[in-house]
């Protein structure tokens, strides 16, 4: 991978108010660009807002569509890669919790959440593919919130060549400190066991549908070390420089990079 500056956003989304959320994104994208960021990651469903109520379907849009066009124009003008969450509706009427990858050259990619938490299963359809994306000299995967609790997904992405995994969340309830303790039970292990960077961020504040989100953003190194974190109930931007030498230091060490010594012929997950 190449050295890269990443921005992760603690962001307040109002459920169903797409225009308001997009306008707020513009502000932070411009700040990120001025700070030298190459990629900015927003939380899960930050554009449409998060809700496990069926009314959230009213905010669903196709991909590509008007939202992706707006973001493509913004990505091109600011010369920054944008990762952002949307309720997506396909041509068969299926509803997905999706995360967009918008590049300045016009590329529009999409990751559809694979593992749907029980309270969301009446609304969202699970995705069925595990895409990886290339941007600014790095290869990365995306997982959305509940996805991160399935460790084999991170290992799959690492084996397929991911240097980092973005894990946007829309995870309500609790304080930022409580959410941080919860994330540290598994996110550091995803980074350490697979020798890659993890970038995780959450929504914050009230969403106008009865949910409150504890603001948190964490960037974790391939040794499982915390590179940077912010806990805040206000919108905040977390910036970090991810260095190829930190990744190489782990992956070239025979006792710190575990994946080459896997025994997949012994594992039966069926």
What are these regions (language model features)?
Residues 48, 100, 111-117, 218, ...:
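Short beta->alpha transition motifs characteristic of CBS
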Residues 2-8:
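Extreme N-terminal starter segment of soluble prokaryotic enzymes
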Residues 20-29, 150-155:
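Short, acidic/polar
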Residues 18, 27-104, 172-189, 193-196:
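Cys-nucleophile CN-hydrolase/nitrilase-fold catalytic domain and related Cys-dependent amidase chemistry
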Residues 101-103, 220-221, 240-241:
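Short beta-strand-to-turn element immediately C-terminal to the catalytic PLP-Schiff-base lysine
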Residues 90-167, 172-185, 249-258, 266:
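Active-site catalytic loop in hydrolytic enzyme cores
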Residues 10-16:
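Short polar catalytic/cofactor-binding loops
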